[in-house]
């Protein structure tokens, strides 16, 4: 899971935080946002490990067979968007170095990344394994160099643009709430729920904090709000393109995998052709997404927390039913593939669907507080109120 959080885009978010916040504000934003992400993903990790189900299977129980199309679409759509962001993050600085239009690089990079996700090239797994220590080493070198050359962290962070801390918290949460929402896809194979929660929480607290710190120190020192340009300004252009490019490639593979699963749940079609469609759409939208990066993060921060909130809330509200399904799988009465196709699975669980819509609306429109927390609280309130209404109607 630690490698999962070593994400180049998080370093670019860190660069934006470094330019916008002073040192105290940066620490506060990363601490609060990191705690929200760790709690959110830790709860999802627990549910995934206890049930052995991925996001789409859990969604069919909590949202219903057709209601699950809503979370599947939102998570798949946002992961497809992250794929596009990753393509653009690599293509734009590469094109500037080569002094060419970025579109050829976008199309080539997007095509190669889509092909590797489609064919499941084993070499990409090796690249993923190697890129984690390499990105840690490159980020540490960049951060230490910037700190020494800038005369210390306090001086580096002195010239800020006055970003509100709560905006910074939103960027932190938005940077990984989409990937974090897919946590059960990875922890469903965990040996125990305890180990799944511990590794997930440590990964998000440690991994994300490191990524934000690498980007923030370099961003504050150079005045650049994109990690590629930060490292180019530090004379690290070639290492940045190789190491960060490899990291983007591997994370984009994971993004298309999650996208394919979500679209497959909606269409009941094989996953692989849908991976190609998602890769094409993500590639075509890459430059637009990059140009609207902060708005994209704000959208994710407000709209995605309600999905994971419902998955966790439904599990704890119906723990015995979930446990019965797990026991049925363990005893061979049903197969693991049939866990979400039982007769008890509803067509649409309206309390869940309405709760997500209400939570997203509150997170997007309420101007005070922390958007993700506002969305979570509203989702829980509407979800349990809706369950109460449905229970009285029976």
Segments predicted by a language model, with ranges:
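C-terminal membrane-solvent junction of multi-pass transporters and transport-like membrane proteins
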Residues: 310-385, 389-394
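Membrane-water interface regions at transmembrane-helix termini and the short interhelical loops
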Residues: 16-17, 45-46, 89-97, 110-131, ...
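N-terminal signal-anchor module of multipass membrane proteins
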Residues: 1-46, 50
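Transmembrane alpha-helical segments of multi-pass small-molecule transport proteins
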Residues: 32, 69-76, 97-119, 133-143, ...
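Membrane-interface loop-to-helix entry segments
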Residues: 91, 104-109, 113-146, 159-160, ...
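Juxtamembrane transmembrane-helix boundary signature
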Residues: 29-63, 70-76, 388-394
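Hydrophobic, membrane-embedded alpha-helices of multi-pass small-molecule transporters
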Residues: 1-11, 143-149, 157-218, 231-253, ...
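Hydrophobic transmembrane alpha-helices that form the core helical bundles
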Residues: 68-99, 110, 248-265, 306
């Amino acid at each position: 899971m630690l490698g999962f959080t070593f994400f180049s885009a998080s370093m670019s978010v860190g660069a934006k935080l470094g330019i916008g916040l002073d040192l105290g504000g940066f620490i506060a934003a990363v601490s609060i946002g990191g705690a929200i992400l760790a709690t959110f993903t830790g709860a999802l990790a627990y549910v995934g490990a206890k049930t052995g189900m991925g996001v789409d299977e859990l969604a069919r129980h909590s949202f219903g067979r057709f209601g699950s199309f809503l979370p599947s679409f939102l998570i798949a759509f946002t992961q497809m968007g992250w794929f596009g962001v990753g393509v653009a993050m690599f293509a734009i600085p590469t094109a500037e170095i080569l002094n060419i239009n970025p579109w050829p690089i976008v199309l080539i990079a997007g095509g190669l990344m889509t092909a590797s996700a489609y064919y499941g090239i084993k070499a990409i797994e090796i690249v993923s394994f190697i890129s984690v220590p390499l990105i840690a080493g490159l980020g540490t070198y960049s951060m230490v160099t910037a700190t020494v050359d800038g005369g210390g962290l306090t001086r580096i962070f002195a010239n800020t643009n006055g970003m509100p801390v709560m905006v910074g918290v939103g960027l932190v949460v938005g940077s990984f709430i989409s990937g974090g929402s897919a946590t059960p896809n990875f922890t469903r194979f965990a040996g125990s729920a305890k180990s799944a929660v511990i590794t997930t929480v440590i990964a998000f607290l440690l991994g994300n904090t490191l990524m934000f710190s690498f980007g923030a120190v370099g961003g504050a020192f150079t005045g650049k709000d994109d990690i590629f340009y930060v490292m180019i300004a530090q004379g690290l252009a070639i290492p940045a393109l190789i190491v960060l490019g490899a990291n983007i490639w591997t994370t984009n593979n994971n993004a298309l995998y999650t996208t394919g699963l979500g679209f497959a749940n909606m269409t009941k079609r094989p996953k692989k052709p849908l991976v190609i469609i998602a890769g094409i759409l993500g590639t075509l939208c890459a430059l637009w997404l990059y140009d609207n990066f902060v708005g994209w993060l704000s959208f994710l921060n407000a709209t995605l927390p309600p999905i994971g909130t419902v998955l966790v809330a439904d599990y704890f509200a119906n723990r015995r039913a979930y446990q019965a399904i797990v026991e049925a799988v363990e005893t061979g009465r049903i197969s693991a593939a049939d866990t979400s196709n039982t007769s008890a699975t509803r067509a649409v669980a309206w309390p869940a669907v309405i709760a997500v819509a209400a939570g997203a609306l509150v997170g997007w429109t309420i101007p005070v507080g922390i958007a993700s927390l506002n969305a979570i609280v509203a989702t829980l309130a509407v979800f349990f109120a809706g369950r109460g209404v449905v229970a009285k109607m029976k």
